[in-house]
Amino acid sequence: MSRRYLFSSESVTEGHPDKICDQISDTILDALLYHDDHSRVAAEVVVNTGLVLITGEITSKAHVNFVELARKKIAEIGYTDADNGFSANSCAVLVAIDEQSPDISQGVSAAHEQRESLSNDELDQIGAGDQGIMFGYACNETPEFMPLPISLAHRISRRLAAVRKMGELPYLRPDGKTQVSIVYEDGKPVGIDTILISTQHTETIDSLTENSAVQAKIKSDLWEAVVQPVFGDIEIKPNQDTRFLVNPTGKFVIGGPQGDAGLTGRKIIVDTYGGYSRHGGGAFSGKDPTKVDRSAAYACRYVAKNIVAAGLADKCEVQVSYAIGVARPVSILVETFGTGKVDEDKLLKVVQELFELRPAGILQTLNLRELPSQRGGRFYQDVAAYGHFGRTDLDLPWEYTDKANLLKEAFAIPLSEVRVGV
């Protein structure tokens, strides 16, 4: 019997209060790793009306100006006008940073396997920075191997920010959210049920002063300048039955940190798969790659994406877990939700042979420590908004499908059937 249902995912723009915090945290991380790629960083940020608080634990040989980094990032996002209730030049920036706990540091610098003389392997030298579970996911719903709802929500958010920054819709302000509800039949996306955009805006637009007229213009402009371009190259498009909601409260003038306080790490579902896959609970931004909340989640995505790209499954979720101070994962699980084309027990063994999931191995494979210096001091801050996965606008090592051929060879599948990822 055919099953029809809706699945929804949301995204937020770079001007959302929580995303401001994520981007400042990762800007600090980039600066520290650029000057000292062995920096240990856990940078947390809070924003409110006229206030930025930078806190956390940092151990590094690098010396950077946290206040200057925060102001520069806030201005880049678009908060340069005090009328927004939050401005790069006028906000207060407070800094309260401690060093990483030596109790944690000793377990990362010398893993349990090394301290107990259980291994001389170089990749057993670094222990996990914390216990925890991490997930990675991929599916064949989009060319970038992401679920369609989150892919579209991010596209709309990025386009919304772009038309603001280009001056195409000059009345837009930095804060905004999007949400897309997809119609599924038997597990396959077949239609667009609802598109929702909430975007901060000026009180009046041109000569329009009545709020109803303002909202009508915003809705018309967003359909033409944002929604239609996003769906230009997508097979599934909105139709006459698709609901298009814009600022459903009726008004969105007060926004950004003036409207809501923001905090690093509070948009973890937006950062990953839009709720389509499970999440271990750990946030990414502000954390150096010895912290497996971040690095192992990237590695799990890398594994899952290569499995789907190799045609071994239509959907794949990878779970890995760690104990603090221990190099080797406590557990690894590969789940294909009944879409696997090969024996799953063998698939797990092949994954363990082809992919390195110890922290030092992840750092080495994905080059996570060196990327900020290799990219001119800017890397992690660019993934801090619009999702860490499925990015077609950034060159991200965990999005490579360079292991797909090896996976196929392990199961004697013709290499001509490998799908190349975006």
UniProtKB/Swiss-Prot annotation:
Pfam family, any one: S-AdoMet_synt_M
Main location: cytoplasm
Residues that hold Mg(2+) according to the record: 18
The record's free-text note on cofactor binding: Binds 2 divalent ions per subunit. Binds 1 potassium ion per subunit.
Catalytic activity from the UniProt record: L-methionine + ATP + H2O = S-adenosyl-L-methionine + phosphate + diphosphate
Domain of life: Bacteria
PROSITE patterns (alphabetical): ADOMET_SYNTHASE_1, ADOMET_SYNTHASE_2
Self-association state and partner proteins as the record states: Homotetramer; dimer of dimers.
Function statement: Catalyzes the formation of S-adenosylmethionine (AdoMet) from methionine and ATP. The overall synthetic reaction is composed of two sequential steps, AdoMet formation and the subsequent tripolyphosphate hydrolysis which occurs prior to release of AdoMet from the enzyme.
Entries under NCBIfam families matching the protein: metK (TIGR01034)
Name of the protein in question: S-adenosylmethionine synthase
Lineage: Bacteria, Bacillati, Cyanobacteriota, Cyanophyceae, Oscillatoriophycideae
